[in-house]
Amino acid sequence: MSPWQPLLLVLLALGYSFAAPHQRQPTYVVFPRDLKTSNLTDTQLAEDYLYRYGYTRAAQMMGEKQSLRPALLMLQKQLSLPQTGELDSETLKAIRSPRCGVPDVGKFQTFDGDLKWHHHNITYWIQSYTEDLPRDVIDDSFARAFAVWSAVTPLTFTRVYGLEADIVIQFGVAEHGDGYPFDGKDGLLAHAFPPGPGIQGDAHFDDDELWSLGKGAVVPTYFGNANGAPCHFPFTFEGRSYLSCTTDGRNDGKPWCGTTADYDTDRKYGFCPSENLYTEHGNGDGKPCVFPFIFEGHSYSACTTKGRSDGYRWCATTANYDQDKADGFCPTRADVTVTGGNSAGEMCVFPFVFLGKQYSTCTSEGRSDGRLWCATTSNFDADKKWGFCPDQGYSLFLVAAHEFGHALGLDHSSVPEALMYPMYHYHEDSPLHEDDIKGIHHLYGRGSKPDPRPPATTAAEPQPTAPPTMCSTAPPMAYPTGGPTVAPTGAPSPGPTGPPTAGPSEAPTESSTPDDNPCNVDVFDAIADIQGALHFFKDGRYWKFSNHGGNQLQGPFLIARTWPAFPSKLNSAFEDPQPKKIFFFLWAQMWVYTGQSVLGPRSLDKLGLGSEVTLVTGLLPRRGGKALLISRERIWKFDLKSQKVDPQSVTRLDNEFSGVPWNSHNVFQYQDKAYFCHDKYFWRVSFHNRVNQVDHVAYVTYDLLQCP
């Protein structure tokens, strides 16, 4: 096998002709690419498969006659199937499953020549994106996929921005420039090249697939009372199940969704990306569409592609575009963006007419396989424009972790539970199997960090998908009023506390238990740089760590003894080094310590933040007495002297810091680099040539605290 041949993760697309009833006569809907194997018998399908993946050729080289049996035996052995030599149901099922497209070499194997990287700091560049997921979800998925391998090896993975990267990541369709074309929906999922210069080491993903986190379309939410949590599909509202966002229960036309499985019980919701909520790009300052609007003398009551050659949907943000020239692009939503059909990438239009009947949701009518589809115009009967509604999709994280294993030099495993097993299968557990670890140790040796489980993610980041090559803009901060039924509840309050009666003092706690060791802490309440030392806060205590003059760890200390006016827990802390002010945040309240005096608690709305802001994730210092105040996925400029935010400065987190988790629970700056913490991990951001770049993803305890 040539080392230049890519590893192709393949799902054999089985096509069918599907019938729709119409006056007792079936109406056939012809689906592009569905007919690739529709006329093949099981034997013909097996012959094609065995030839494509090298089994037939290998059997011939062993002197076997033209017979399926020897090749089937080899296939069944490689895939750990019962070795019958027959084309039985289990073998056919495997043939129809997602898998890599090169000959299988066996477990613990690497490419011919034992190809590997000969340096340990591997760089990668995300050259292009899919519109199926928000960009920071994609960035996070790739970072977590690399973390799978860095956790068990001495390798580190650094994101860069340019072709000099060792691993270049891109999304493409069909023939995308490397001589190994993708073949549409449910065909080749991805491929990667073995380590080496040029195209070697690169990983490509088929953009005709639906990329998700493995549980269906990812739709972020805004506002509502779910703090930006993604939609949960299906969700129940008034006893009815919904597979996509809906306007039911509202009279303003703004689509919404439940963020748990049962809105009727949990009352958690958010608003879905919609032109009735905001627009992207353009010159309309993110304002929502105004319908109807006038363009070239014609009236439009919905987003349109008129006047554009690129197919992007847009609208005017005033009633008369001809007069005001104010416009924006209409957001897309993964839950109604179709795949396949003859309108891939377009959005379902509801309601639509099919065989004279009106449909307000995706339907399986007219199909014998039960797959859900929709029209992308209001009348399928007239326009014949359609596509498949989103399914569960493929986990970008899992596929990327598999592909990056190939990019590091690993071939396939014959252990079905291994990440490097040829077939795709979704699971939520730690993806690495002992088989994978043995293989990567064979190439690069052991790592120093335990627990190879990668950081978890909460499924989606609350940003809409942006068209490629365009920078995203923030939605307007004028909030919709009211939910489908009830208003959100407020954040918990810690209760008032009095000013300190004495100056801060520091003394370690008297007892010594395993809990006194910060290396035993899974997730800290907050981390902050105070007086040049990192302070790690947890459950009313804190530790100080400094690497000046060697690594020095002190504590634990009692928060109540050092800062008597403060509650025992906090969400974030920040020191303004010039006047030596320390800001503490707990939910919707803030305290400021200056020497021996304290100001607070003050509510966050006194800072100029809206009442919907109930958490400060952290502050990052900037010049001129300013800071960036971060609350989950949003950022404001904050004046440290007046202690006010600039309400016009609000923007999305990914506009400033691409690639960090939107749901970081703590953000701080240390030694001129920003740290975004999620779970037990941190994403480190360096500031280089005015570009904020994630340069390291690692463990808080092992890498920051230097725990053994």
Swiss-Prot record:
Residues engaged in binding Zn(2+) 1: 176, 178, 191, 204
Region (Disordered): 441-520
Binding site residues for Ca(2+) 3: 183-184, 186, 188, 206, 209
CDD domains: FN2, HX, ZnMc_MMP
Residue ranges of the propeptide: 20-107
EC number from the UniProt entry: 3.4.24.35
Cofactor binding, note field: Binds 2 Zn(2+) ions per subunit.
Residue ranges occupied by any Fibronectin type-II domain in the UniProt entry: 226-274, 284-332, 343-391
Alphabetical GO biological process terms: apoptotic process; cell migration; cellular response to cell-matrix adhesion; cellular response to cytokine stimulus; cellular response to interleukin-1; cellular response to iron(III) ion; cellular response to lipopolysaccharide; cellular response to low-density lipoprotein particle stimulus
Residues annotated as binding Zn(2+) 2: 100, 402, 406, 412
Entry protein name: Matrix metalloproteinase-9
